[in-house]
């Protein structure tokens, strides 16, 4: 469906687009093309103003029940009006008088084509649209947006590239085409903060109709923004809530969905047309109950995120529109061209609001000499922070690969630099308290972080990035450090330049960068289970296909050996984390055990019942040998004795030397089995 967005339906960015009410005199002076733009108002008016409305007679004049109170009456017969009263906004017949809006209400019946609307209908749609506050203009003021979506406060002023009229037109055309859309743009153009808001607006106006060429029944469904982490759900929902002029969730168009969500973050009066911010796992549980699907941070290749893309592509007729958003397509463009049916690619040009300077610090050691490379890197980091120092009251972010390195680098820097040092990563619980200290401190703050800070939290006073250029890629029973991809570099660099000019200092040779095929270092059981649930054909229906298909088929055989029905697996997928697939054997045993095991997965509280139940699974690892790493750590070289990876090697760190065997409790907890 090719359809352009008329100017009068632009979302108010409060820079060069404002909420506006048009007068009948303005309509009289418009060209035919401008007048015809009002025909599209029939769709939001039918949904939000005329739904369940009827004709009343108010002071002798026929009106819609949404205009005035009055007794329900039979509608009058309508021919061409004898007179038009622009001031009273009424059509006058010899026998009766009818409001502009009531005339349109009676004329706009199912299957009427909108290009057949005459001036009389359009004038009524203008009045109904004014009452809904759905129109916009290039003149106005912020306060005119109060009440547009039931908001008590005005919309935020947004100068970002994604809300310019040009971008709004392009995004609307892609959205209404029902083609899958791949949207890119530099960090800072407003992809995550503004595009979902824009799609919410389009959904409010036109969502649920099968066509915008004629009046049809509608099926209203919300928009969903699917995100890889709870921190992102909370961050982006709060940003958009405030920018739409709301201070509380209840009654707003914003809802949140994630596991163990607190009561105060539940919208008890959600809007049918609204937007749901959800973690990927919960998005999958009700994927087809949403009209527009937005998947953000596609470049991260979160496992469940990639599965959502595969499911949505397989069942694209069940979703009105799908948007994949990513900072860069460096690694995925060719795959998306082949994988998605007739995709539309949109790039929002633009950069961060402020200039970002780049500085390269060369490490003279080859990365293959790992320990020497890191020692040189730490020395270089101290020198770089001394040379390129954030101003007082500002902060810098040091990107390292792992939580362990956060502590290692913090300890090293504290001994050599006089600045406030903090650690932030996904397992830190008091991030808000840390940020309060960072924002209130008159000193320089240095924050050491994992890739978590690439997107999960926005730090408003950061001016410098110090990027080691590495990431820890988890793998079954282990993992390894790798150099980052270009998309990760872009994300890290884009943490500055949003509020003030920024500096990006990097400590790695650009030739070391490479794309990361995460699926090749993941447990694959979710791909099997969701493929069964959504009738995916493996491996061709997967967005990213594993390099080693043998592991995929071994995983399928292992899951089949559990002798759990597809129906039961689907219930387990919807209700439990199952961080280890073997937990499924326990979840099906009894409701009491399932409840305690679920609590362990959510909170980490390990009861004796859960401990003994997991130990009964005999998830055993054999210790081959060990070596001393430092004062309180020993590295153990082991062999896996269960599951898909039976017979493969693993490395485990422990505070004392172990021999014999250990039993796995979780991905981070194990129990030594002495003399066995």
Curated annotation (Swiss-Prot):
Q: Name one Pfam family in it.
A: DEAD
> E.C. number, please?
3.6.4.13
Q: Which InterPro entries match?
A: DEAD/DEAH_box_helicase_dom (IPR011545), DNA/RNA_helicase_DEAH_CS (IPR002464), Helicase_ATP-bd (IPR014001), Helicase_C-like (IPR001650), NPH-II (IPR021892), P-loop_NTPase (IPR027417)
* Residue ranges of the motif DEXH box: 296-299
Q: Main EC class of this protein? A: hydrolase
Show where the Helicase C-terminal domain sits. Answer: 366-535
Mainly resides where?
virion
Listed under catalytic activity are: ATP + H2O = ADP + phosphate + H(+)
Domain Helicase ATP-binding: residue ranges: 172-347
Give an example GO molecular function: ATP hydrolysis activity
Q: What induces or represses this gene?
A: Expressed both early and late in the viral replicative cycle.
Q: Which family does it belong to?
A: Belongs to the DEAD box helicase family. DEAH subfamily.
Purpose of the protein:
NTP-dependent helicase that catalyzes unidirectional unwinding of 3'tailed duplex RNAs and plays an important role during transcription of early mRNAs, presumably by preventing R-loop formation behind the elongating RNA polymerase. Might also play a role in the export of newly synthesized mRNA chains out of the core into the cytoplasm. Required for replication and propagation of viral particles.
Subunit description: Monomer.
Q: Which protein, by its recorded name, is this? A: RNA helicase NPH-II
This chain is encoded by the gene named OPG084
């Amino acid at each position: 469906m090719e359809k352009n967005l008329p100017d009068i339906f632009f979302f108010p960015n409060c820079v060069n687009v404002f909420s506006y009410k048009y007068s009948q005199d303005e309509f009289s002076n418009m060209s035919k093309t401008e007048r015809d733009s009002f025909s599209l108002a029939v769709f939001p008016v039918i949904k939000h103003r005329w739904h369940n409305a009827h004709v009343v007679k108010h002071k002798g004049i026929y009106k819609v029940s949404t205009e005035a109170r009055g007794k329900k009456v039979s509608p009058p017969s309508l021919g061409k009006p004898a007179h038009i009263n622009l001031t009273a906004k009424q059509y006058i017949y010899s026998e009766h008088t009818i409001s502009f809006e009531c005339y349109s209400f009676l004329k706009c019946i199912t299957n009427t084509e909108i290009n057949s609307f005459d001036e009389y209908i359009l004038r009524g749609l203008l009045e109904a649209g004014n009452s809904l506050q759905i129109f916009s203009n290039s003149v106005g003021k912020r306060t005119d947006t109060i009440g547009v979506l039931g908001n008590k406060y005005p919309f935020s002023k947004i100068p970002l590239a994604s809300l310019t009229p040009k971008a709004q037109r392009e995004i609307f055309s892609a959205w209404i085409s029902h083609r899958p859309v791949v949207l890119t743009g530099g960090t800072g153009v407003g992809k995550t903060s503004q595009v979902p808001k824009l799609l919410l607006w389009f959904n409010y106006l036109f969502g649920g109709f099968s066509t915008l060429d004629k009046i049809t029944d509608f099926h209203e469904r919300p928009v969903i923004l699917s995100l890889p982490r709870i921190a992102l759900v909370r961050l982006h929902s709060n940003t958009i809530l405030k920018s739409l002029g709301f201070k509380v969730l209840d009654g707003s168009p914003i809802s949140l969905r994630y596991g163990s969500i607190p009561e105060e973050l539940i919208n008890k009066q959600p809007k049918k047309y609204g937007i749901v911010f959800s973690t990927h796992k919960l998005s999958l549980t009700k994927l087809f109950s949403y009209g527009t699907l937005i998947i953000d941070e596609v470049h991260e290749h979160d496992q469940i995120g990639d599965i959502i893309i595969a499911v949505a592509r397989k069942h694209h007729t069940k979703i009105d529109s799908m948007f994949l958003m990513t900072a860069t397509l460096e690694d995925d463009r060719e795959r998306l061209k082949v994988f998605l049916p007739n995709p539309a690619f949109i790039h929002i040009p633009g950069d961060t609001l402020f200039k970002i300077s780049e500085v390269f610090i060369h490490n003279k050691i080859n990365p293959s000499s790992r320990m020497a490379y890191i020692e040189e890197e730490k020395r270089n980091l101290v020198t770089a922070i001394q040379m390129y120092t954030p101003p007082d009251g500002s902060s810098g972010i040091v990107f390292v690969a792992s939580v362990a390195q956060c502590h290692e680098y913090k300890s090293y820097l504290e001994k050599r630099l006089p600045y406030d040092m903090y650690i932030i990563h996904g397992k830190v619980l008091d991030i808000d308290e840390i940020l309060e200290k960072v924002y209130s401190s008159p000193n320089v703050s240095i924050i050491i972080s994992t890739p978590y800070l690439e997107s999960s939290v926005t730090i408003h006073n950061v001016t410098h990035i110090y990027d080691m250029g590495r990431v820890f890629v988890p793998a079954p029973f282990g993992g390894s450090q790798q150099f980052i991809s270009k998309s990760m570099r872009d994300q890290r660099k884009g943490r500055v330049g949003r509020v003030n000019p920024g500096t990006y200092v990097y400590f790695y040779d650009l030739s070391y960068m490479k794309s990361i095929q995460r699926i090749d270092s993941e447990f694959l059981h979710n791909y099997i289970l969701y493929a069964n649930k959504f009738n995916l054909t493996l491996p061709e229906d997967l967005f990213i296909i594993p390099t080693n298909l043998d592991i995929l088929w071994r995983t399928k055989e292992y899951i089949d050996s559990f002798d759990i029905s597809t129906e039961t697996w689907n219930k387990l997928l919807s209700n439990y984390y199952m961080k280890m697939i073997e937990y499924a054997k326990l979840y099906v045993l009894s409701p009491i055990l399932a409840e305690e095991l679920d609590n362990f997965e959510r909170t980490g509280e390990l009861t004796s019942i859960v401990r003994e139940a997991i130990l009964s699974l005999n998830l055993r690892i054999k210790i081959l040998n060990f070596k001393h790493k430092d004062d309180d750590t020993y590295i153990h070289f082991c062999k896996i004795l269960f599951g898909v990876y039976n017979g493969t090697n693993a490395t485990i760190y422990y505070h004392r030397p172990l021999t014999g065997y250990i039993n796995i409790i979780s991905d981070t907890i194990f129990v030594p089995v002495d003399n066995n």
